[in-house]
Regions:
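Cys-dependent protein tyrosine phosphatase-like superfamily
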Residues: 1-141, 153-246
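Ser/Thr-glycine-rich phosphate-binding loops at phosphate-binding pockets of nucleotides
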Residues: 146, 150-151
Length: 246
């Protein structure tokens, strides 16, 4: 496993912001740092965060939230030189399939939700990966609400197609559990009357991503096969490897 740990976020109001780089790929190269970041919702950063955000050189923000979530909470500040792309991979409202009513483990529940998103959100996922593949957009930050589910899928697909071993892809995904707990602690301290988040929001079991990747490959032959099915071109896949691997 690559020696990559979850760093402290440079932004006080973000809890799952981190560099996706640093992982070893199967061909001896390494995923470049400072090119792709993942995060929970960026609407909580403000003018006091401008210098830290600018220091990262971020050019593009990919927001995977539902339109209603963007309308409710707002978006990343409109910093100079920043391109904002709202891409919502279509998927069912999880409220219609509550974990408490599912009768399965949390890992199985989440993996099923991810599989549903991979089936219905192909266009959005392909668009997001295509944007990441274009070096002119880098550095890129991809985020959703908690930065673990929709963002976790996009980052897992990206790392996998770069040749990062499943062990590391799964470990990167599982880092979001600690981030969710930090967020929950912050909510308790700042909004004591807020409702406790449900288990699917708080946990990122490693088994979830193991199941998702295994079953995706069973259906499409490989992660690359899935991305091609979704609409990512061979040229985009080659570009992804060219600029994200050292």
């Amino acid at each position: 496993m690559s020696d990559v740990d979850a760093p402290e976020s440079p932004f006080p109001a973000l809890f799952n912001f981190r560099d996706v780089g640093g992982y070893a790929a199967g061909d001896g190269r390494t995923v470049r740092r400072g090119r792709l970041y993942r995060s929970d919702s960026l609407h909580r950063i403000d003018e006091t965060d401008r210098s830290a955000f600018t220091a990262l050189g971020i050019r593009t923000v990919i927001d995977l939230r539902r339109p209603s979530e963007v309308e409710r909470d707002g978006r990343v500040p409109d910093y100079d030189g920043l391109t904002y792309r709202h891409i919502h991979p279509e998927h069912a409202d999880w409220g219609a399939n509550r974990f408490d009513d599912s009768g399965v483990s949390l890992a199985r529940y989440l993996a099923d939700r991810y599989a549903d998103l991979a089936r219905t959100g192909t266009a959005g996922l392909a668009e997001a990966v295509g944007l990441i593949a274009d070096s002119a957009n880098a550095p890129v930050v991809v985020h959703c609400v908690a930065g673990k589910d929709r963002t976790g899928i996009v980052c897992a697909l990206t790392l996998s197609v770069l040749g990062v071993p499943d062990e590391d892809v799964v470990a990167d995904y599982a880092l979001s559990t600690a981030a969710s707990r930090r967020f929950t602690a912050w909510v308790r301290s700042t909004l004591p009357d807020a409702e406790e988040p449900p288990p699917p929001f708080l946990e990122s079991p490693a088994e979830t991503m193991e199941l998702f990747l295994t079953e995706l490959r069973a259906g499409y032959g490989s992660v690359e096969g899935y991305l091609t099915h979704a609409g990512v071109t061979d040229a985009q896949l080659e570009s992804l490897r060219t600029h994200l691997l050292d």
